[in-house]
Amino acid sequence: MTHPDISVDVLVIGAGPTGLGAAKRLNQIDGPSWMIVDSNETPGGLASTDVTPEGFLYDVGGHVIFSHYKYFDDCLDEALPKEDDWYTHQRISYVRCQGQWVPYPFQNNISMLPKEEQVKCIDGMIDAALEARVANTKPKTFDEWIVRMMGTGIADLFMRPYNFKVWAVPTTKMQCAWLGERVAAPNLKAVTTNVILGKTAGNWGPNATFRFPARGGTGGIWIAVANTLPKEKTRFGEKGKVTKVNANNKTVTLQDGTTIGYKKLVSTMAVDFLAEAMNDQELVGLTKQLFYSSTHVIGVGVRGSRPERIGDKCWLYFPEDNCPFYRATIFSNYSPYNQPEASKKLPTMQLADGSRPQSTEAKEGPYWSIMLEVSESSMKPVNQETILADCIQGLVNTEMLKPTDEIVSTYHRRFDHGYPTPTLEREGALTQILPKLQDKDIWSRGRFGSWRYEVGNQDHSFMLGVEAVDNIVNGAVELTLNYPDFVNGRQNTERRLVDGAQVFAKSKAQ
């Protein structure tokens, strides 16, 4: 057997949040030799940011930085240490329903709806509350969970149509163990009180406040984190593209023919791609049981000041079929640097109603922007040719844009692997796939590496990498991967970027 060109103790494939988490921890421990490779020149993976020619920024989806982990905060604060690197926002979100903006969470604010809809919703909630008292089995599907928690009124008005738009899979085909803290259970007494008094209920959930980077979008965070790693241990771009993983002799082949030998492998590529790269037919067969949806990210840059009807809304949910998108993010509200300066002159491309502008002469701003997400799967196809126009029409239909609004920039990008779907078959497949890989010294981790949506946010993904390294180096239990509800229900403060061992090492060196 020929020797590999490069040999390391731990090889990390992928420089998204998970791979960077693994690399940060390896660099901190300063024990095993390591290297990180990625086929993109720019690190960030699914948490990167694009810039349109006109100067509008769009994240690859509706990212916000909410953290369950002190270690994650430490790493971000180290990468972007200045106060003016960040903006902090209150979560202000609404559901568009029956021509109204209903504050989120929808199920706590049905007092905003027309009276007959209120009756249907409360009727269903009373039935659900009575059922819950006598139920002695857990719900088997997401659909059963919805009906049991909220009743058929809210299920039909919001939860079923909205979740089909998000997941591109019917709720009857999804399991419900993933839910944890992600959906607010309604309080029947509070809802009834609010309906009678005509009140609305306030913020709920983990992202009630969140911070967002001032410059460079979400992608700017991960570029900054990657910049804290030693350059000689990174290999990004074409020269870092993995074409083959030979699990038997523990080598990875890159596109330029370079081979890297490893003792342990942390792979953050989608596990279905990993199985293909390994040419392991048994694993390929098992990964076929995993379902995912694709995500279309659509951006629309608009001339003018942000209208009052939009105000300081952050993100908005759309369960109805008068628009293709399930979520809109007012991306210009997150940072003034997410769009061009008002003094920049841009021509009008079209009006929101699709008509041509009277003049195509470049004019000054100011500008604001909307980012939209549309899901796609075999069960919910999307027409690529018309999706942008359909979304702009949807913005007019939902009164997000006026027909005469001037559009100065558009953006559309499709991400094949967008959401790892928590289908009924998921755990049966994962509980075979992940241990089989681990037996071969491969830790497959990340949003699509370990395929668990409930630990697929940026903070979770980062910690999946950190914890994989701790497991490799000293056998520590991977809490995030194995106990999602546990980590999501507490402040995880035990692990820090500067720990005791490093403090002692520093004092010795002095």
Swiss-Prot record:
Protein name: UDP-galactopyranose mutase
Gene: glfA
Native source species: Aspergillus fumigatus
One Pfam short name: NAD_binding_8
Entry cofactors: FAD
GO molecular function, one term: nucleotide binding
Superkingdom in the source lineage: Eukaryota
EC identifiers of the protein: 5.4.99.9
Protein residues bound to NADPH: 68, 91, 93, 104, 203, 315, 317, 419, 447, 457, 460
Family: Belongs to the UDP-galactopyranose/dTDP-fucopyranose mutase family.
